[in-house]
């Protein structure tokens, strides 16, 4: 039987130790996730809420996953696995070793919406055809995967590390913000934008349910798009579509818009906007400097109230290129050798 005092000690010890290790070397993995249960607009375990806030204040970098159900696991950028069989699972990076996504096929929403406008058609009709086709392609991919499995070509599946029946076929979305902008919709917490997001994600969810069987599960994920977001923007610009930036957003807000405050960002990644996003999205809250523990604690309450279930805080850490010193704060001069030859990382 698990010992809570021992587990509690180990979790706290590991987080404090790993936070210090990141002052010795640039470490991107493992990705830590603090899983918190919420109730009535706050974290249920107040002691761990305070510990989470303190760790953020001390400069630690980790995700927080918040749920009002104790049946969920999460890790990495966009992953959630719920034990209940309701077709709701974050899939980028596995919450359980055997669960994840076996294929991600991404739709360029900006291009689709603008093409529908060019043709004088409702964007939902145009998208319905594209999304239906995407599901058929995913099913074909799945049949190919099963054929490879039957021929013994997938050793990790055979060894039980990955369960093909628990792997999702994922419909990725990119260009949501840009698609809305092309229609003249203001990107903020407003009814028009909320309805636009709901129309698109609700449509994808409809097809996910339609194509789901006992053997095949689908979900929808707002992909990180570090690579494809740039490609979509470049391809669309070359073909004469409206392209407002060089990399399409992977958030529900415009990243470079300084008028969107912290609270609104939590709302735009809250339950009203992510309701149909069954594959997940992560709010990366970019800040210039670390907040205090009480400030982070208040933001945990905001997240619980707004239903923002997956988030982290990105603050530039200072890396000295001359002496190699790493500091948790956003500095203009190395405190160790006083060099100004610096780089920054989050």
Outline where the language-model segments fall:
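Well-ordered alpha-helical scaffold segments within catalytic/enzyme domains
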Residues: 178-186
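Conserved catalytic cores of very large enzyme subunits
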Residues: 1-165, 186, 190-343
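Core structural elements
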Residues: 158-179
């Amino acid at each position: 039987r698990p010992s809570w005092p021992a587990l509690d000690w180990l979790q706290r010890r590991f987080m404090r130790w790993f936070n210090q290790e990141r002052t010795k070397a640039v470490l991107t993995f493992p990705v830590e996730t603090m899983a918190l249960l919420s109730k009535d607009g706050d974290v249920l375990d107040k002691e761990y809420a305070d510990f989470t806030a303190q760790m953020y204040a001390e400069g630690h970098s980790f995700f927080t996953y918040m749920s009002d159900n104790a049946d969920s696991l999460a890790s990495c950028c966009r992953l959630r696995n719920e034990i209940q069989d309701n077709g709701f699972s974050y899939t980028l990076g596995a919450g359980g070793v055997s669960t994840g996504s076996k294929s991600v096929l991404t739709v360029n929403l900006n291009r689709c919406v603008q093409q529908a406008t060019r043709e004088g058609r409702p964007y939902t009709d145009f998208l319905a055809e594209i999304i239906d086709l995407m599901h058929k392609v995913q099913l074909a991919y799945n049949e190919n995967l099963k054929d490879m499995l039957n021929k013994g070509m997938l050793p990790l599946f055979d060894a039980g590390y990955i369960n093909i029946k628990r792997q999702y076929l994922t419909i990725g979305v990119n260009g949501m913000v840009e698609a809305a902008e092309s229609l003249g919709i203001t990107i903020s917490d407003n009814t028009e934008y909320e309805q636009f997001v709901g129309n698109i994600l609700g449509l994808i969810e409809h097809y996910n349910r339609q194509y789901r069987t006992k053997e095949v599960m689908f979900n929808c994920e707002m992909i990180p798009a570090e690579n494809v977001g740039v490609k979509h923007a470049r391809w669309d610009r070359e073909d004469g579509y409206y392209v407002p930036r060089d990399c399409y957003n992977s958030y529900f807000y415009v990243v470079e818009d300084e008028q969107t405050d912290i609270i609104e960002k939590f709302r735009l990644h809250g339950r009203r906007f992510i309701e149909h996003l069954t594959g997940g999205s992560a709010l990366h809250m970019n800040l210039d400097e670390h907040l205090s523990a009480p400030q982070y604690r208040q933001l945990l309450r905001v997240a619980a109230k707004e239903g923002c279930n997956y988030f982290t805080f990105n603050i530039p850490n200072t890396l000295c290129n001359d002496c190699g010193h790493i500091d948790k704060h956003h500095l203009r001069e190395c405190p160790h050798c006083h060099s100004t030859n610096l780089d920054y990382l989050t």
